[in-house]
A protein has these predicted regions:
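A positional/architectural concept
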Residues: 8, 12-66
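Active-site cofactor/substrate anionic-group-binding motifs, chiefly glycine-
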Residues: 50, 71-72
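Short beta->alpha connector loops at strand-helix junctions that form conserved
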Residues: 66-68, 144
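Glycine-rich hexapeptide-repeat left-handed beta-helix
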Residues: 1-12, 46, 54, 60-61, ...
Length: 167
């Protein structure tokens, strides 16, 4: 892992979290308890802060960044799939962001939502709570079922277990 100060600000990373080799975390980044940041992920808090809350997993090759005056906030119990990009946006609690998705500046993903693989959420779009969105640009498909909500939680639980198995 590579942790870098930016303009005198060092990332704040909980000792209960796991940052994997080749991940890069720079600047005004706060990572809470039991967060996993997997191989080759990059998290940059150089233009505004990045906050990632507990039990969240940032999978391989993700990019988390900000824009001037636009922070990035990722809530509790979130799965950010491989190679997803979250740029100056908010992801509320209990969400799954599919592989290769792109969440752009000012967008908000409401809690308990699922952004399908490869989906592009345009700037300033609001995804309502408990919603499935897919496509480029995103389209709201429907409310999530109870089974889908359980699967989001199971995915988060799986990554917590997986993180604990690495030394």
């Amino acid at each position: 892992m590579y942790i870098e100060e930016y303009m005198g600000i060092e990332p704040k990373i909980s000792k209960r979290s796991k940052i994997f080799k080749n991940a890069v975390i720079a600047g005004d980044v706060t990572i809470s308890d039991y967060v996993s940041v997997w191989y080759n992920a990059t998290i940059r808090g150089d233009m505004a802060p990045v906050v990632i809350l507990e039990n969240t997993n940032i999978q391989d090759n993700c990019v988390i960044h900000t824009n001037t005056g636009l922070p990035t906030h990722i809530g509790k119990n979130v799965t950010v799939g491989h190679a997803a990009i979250i740029h100056a946006a908010t992801v509320e609690d209990n969400c799954l962001i599919g592989m290769g998705s792109i969440i752009l500046d000012g967008a908000v993903i409401g809690k308990n939502s699922l952004v399908g693989a490869g989906c592009v959420v345009p700037p300033n779009k609001i995804v309502p709570e408990n919603t499935l969105v897919v496509g480029n640009p995103m389209k709201i498909i429907r409310k999530l079922s109870e089974d889908e909500l359980k699967n989001i939680s199971l995915n988060k639980d799986y990554y917590l277990k997986l993180m604990s198995e690495y030394k």
